[in-house]
Amino acid sequence: MAEQSFRPLSSPQKVPAYSQNAKAMTTNIISTVLRDNFTISTWLLIGGLLQGVAVALLGYLTLLPAAVVITYRVGDNILMIWGWKKNRYLSGVFFNKFTAQVPRSDGSFGSTPAASSLVVFLIGSKCNHPLGAFDPVYRKVSDYFAAMVRELQADAEVSGLLGATPFIGNSEATANQAMSVMYFRDLESLHKYAHGPFHMKAVKYWGQIVKNTPHVSIYHETYVVPKGQWETIYGNSKPTGLSAAAFPVHPAQGNGETEWMSPNVDARHPSLRSAAGRIQSDYLKGYEEKHSEIWDKTFDVDYGDIAP
């Protein structure tokens, strides 16, 4: 008897999930970078100065808008804490445990974990200039990167891009590095884009300015991960990393057009319940068998809904 296939948590979509959230993500990235560009004390001083000017010019009534907004926000969160209002921070969260697996070309899933190889590409930048993200050269470099991501996403089936998740570092008080973890179908796709016209245009620009702009740092790391040598697990999580990717598929019941499949499947499948199973490692199984009862409790079938 054939082993049961992995159970997907969603159906194929007409467009990749990440493209549906592109506008909101862009806004969030800009907001995060701007907030990170100055220390908290600097932001408080800016706010205090502006409020002081407003009071001096228009009187103490100018304190009212700030008081109203703060009261609303505090009250809104208290209502969510007490359960009198839906917790909007849980929107999009997948409850229980799930894992990201590569679907077949028809959108179905087999029963073998990590059945395909992947390319993980880390790319980032940092500005070591007093202006931080407002430095003109750094802004130009950032604009090039944003445009390249849009180009990759616009024709992801050809470019081989599966998904990307942006991050901001926290090693410094301000102007931390910005990094994106990107996933590609194969190294050939990544290499082909690297030698394409737009990326080469960006490389040419970098070659022109790098000598005179030592304050702008860029880097990337590439990892080619063979099949059976990677694993993922998420609990009570919104899609992120590989789980936020989208794979081009052509379902048998479709009309021949490309659709996009989320890689997320129920982790309660016997082959997915532990890291040893997900990464196909007999070496690790001996360690995990000692604590099998503890692992099993984290997969309680009555724990919660598997999808939002």
Task: Outline where the language-model segments fall.
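Short, well-ordered beta-strand segments in beta-rich or mixed alpha/beta enzyme
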Residues: 121-125, 168-196
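Short, surface-exposed, charge-dense and proline/glycine-enriched linear segments
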Residues: 185-202, 244-258
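Residue-level signal for the start and early helices of compact helical domains
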Residues: 114-116, 175, 181, 211-214
